[in-house]
Curated annotation (Swiss-Prot):
GO molecular function: neurohypophyseal hormone activity; toxin activity
Entry-linked InterPro entries: Neurhyp_horm, Neurhyp_horm_dom_sf, Neurohypophysial_hormone_CS
Signal peptide stretch: 1-22
Residue ranges listed under propeptide: 32-39
Primary location recorded for the protein, binned into one broad class: secreted
Magnesium listed as a keyword: no
Protein name: Conopressin-conophysin, isoform 1
Species, as recorded: Conus monile (Necklace cone)
Amino acid sequence: MQMGRPTLLPCLLLLLVLSTQACFIRNCPEGGKRDVHMIQPTKPCMNCSFGQCVGPRVCCGAGRCEIGSTEADRCEEENEDPVPCKVLGQHCVLNNPGNVNGNCVDGGIGICCVDDTCAIHRRCD
């Protein structure tokens, strides 16, 4: 069976399209296709009146955490920044479904925080 030129060209184009892993305008990552596997940059979480922000409206330090107080309201600004922040301190694990990897709040106050909650943790003393 012989394939004519009019048939060969569309077949080659179809093969080319199917074999490439294209990144179209609607689904490209911000840094381009090669940026997908890069580690996302982080920065230390901002400071609040007596410690460090560990979540929106959550401020921890000096042996305590405050949630929703006027001192912790400044931490809401962290949500406006597109670069995610990381709580300073050693790694800890919470029993929080879907969000278990956290960090101890700096200062050895015995509190471990993940993105949306904090709890007393013996590893953080």
